From Swiss-Prot:
Function noted in UniProt: DNA-binding protein that preferentially recognizes a curved DNA sequence. It is probably a functional analog of DnaJ; displays overlapping activities with DnaJ, but functions under different conditions, probably acting as a molecular chaperone in an adaptive response to environmental stresses other than heat shock. Lacks autonomous chaperone activity; binds native substrates and targets them for recognition by DnaK. Its activity is inhibited by the binding of CbpM.
Keywords tagged on the record: Chaperone, Cytoplasm, DNA-binding
Limits of the J domain: 5-69
Keyword Transferase: no
Pfam families linked to this entry: DnaJ, DnaJ_C
HAMAP family named in the record: CbpA
PROSITE patterns in the cross-refs: DNAJ_1, DNAJ_2
UniProt keyword annotation of Iron present: no
Gene Ontology molecular function: bent DNA binding; unfolded protein binding
Localization annotation: Cytoplasm, Nucleoid
GO BP term, example: chaperone cofactor-dependent protein refolding
Name the UniProt record assigns to this protein: Curved DNA-binding protein
CC per GO annotation: cytoplasm; nucleoid
């Protein structure tokens, strides 16, 4: 097993300070990141750079490595790197040598376990109309690159084309496996989670799987009954207003709410009685005739009663 020249890998000198090495690491990590670089050996180079940074960014491990590198050409050191028959050592032999020179801490540091990458969570805005059918969406997000200390060194822009299934609800989470940050030492990538946010609609309010819409009607439409055109998510329908309807009354339109795999909600039309503008003399006379005809009607009769 070859003792790697971590300084050469990073393109720095052994005398360079941590700030210089950190700058080199950021530049190389961006250059060779598998999601950005088009070079065939990008993944291998990226891991090599990460390995070098993991050692050189730690003061104690860097000192141990420098000592090992300094004695790499010593006869005693060279003899330890070969068997008596001249054959190269294996990984187990290297671990024994590594441990004998720097102690158990170095061996434990060398044998770092595979670590799963971090998950990423982003919010995706979806219009109500888009929930009716499956649709494709291009999303962009930043992929964090972590250093050996678990701190974010940089963020690399990434773009994906994804499918948003029909019937998604507000707050629903969609998992895209392996689209999070890369794992370390052969560990699996993290996942990308899309958190659905249903954008506010100018007409409809969401109540579970149902929708509510406020329908303005005139006093005479409420009193006499009428048929009015009401929009739904798919098309407009003709809604029947029963005679004697009241303000705030809810009229149910079955099957015109949100659609999911389990159920289809309903649409509720909430009536809002809208008065005409200030009446002229003739209109005021008609309102007075109505008031005289309904003089026994007391709208506040049960006001305040349970």
């Amino acid at each position: 097993m070859e003792l790697k020249d971590y300084y050469a890998i990073m393109g720095v000198k052994p005398t360079d300070d941590l700030k210089t090495i950190k700058t080199a690491y950021r530049r190389l990590a961006r250059k060779y990141h598998p999601d950005v670089s088009k070079e065939p050996d990008a993944e291998a180079r990226f891991k090599e750079v990460a390995e070098a940074w993991e050692v050189l960014s730690d003061e104690q491990r860097r000192a141990e490595y420098d000592q090992m590198w300094q004695h790499r050409n010593d006869p005693q050191f060279s003899r330890q790197f070969q068997h008596g028959d001249g054959q190269s050592f294996n990984a187990e032999d290297f671990d024994d040598i590594f441990s004998s020179i720097f102690g158990q801490h170095a061996r434990q540091s060398h044998q770092r376990p595979a670590t799963r990458g971090h998950d990423i969570e982003i919010e995706v805005a979806v219009f109500l109309e888009e929930t009716l059918t499956e649709h494709k969406r291009t999303i962009s997000y930043n992929l964090p690159v972590y250093n050996a200390f678990g701190m974010i060194e940089q963020e690399i822009p990434k773009t994906l084309k994804v499918k948003i299934p029909a019937g998604v609800g507000n707050g629903q989470r969609i998992r895209l496996k392996g689209q999070g940050t890369p794992g370390e030492n052969g560990g699996p990538n993290g996942d990308l989670w899309l958190v659905i946010h249903i954008a506010p609609h100018p007409l409809f309010d969401i109540v579970g799987q149902d929708l509510e819409i406020v329908v303005p009607v005139s006093p005479w439409e409420a009193a006499l009954g009428a048929k009015v055109t009401v929009p739904t998510l798919k098309e407009s329908i003709l809604l029947t207003i029963p005679p004697g309807s009241q303000a705030g009354q809810r009229l149910r339109v079955k099957g015109k709410g949100l659609v999911s795999k389990k159920q289809t909600g309903d649409l509720y039309a909430v009536l809002k009685i809208v008065m005409p503008p200030k009446p002229d003399e003739n209109t005021a006379a008609l309102w007075q005739q109505l008031a005289d005809a309904q003089s026994s009607f007391e709208p506040r009769k049960d006001w305040g009663k349970a």
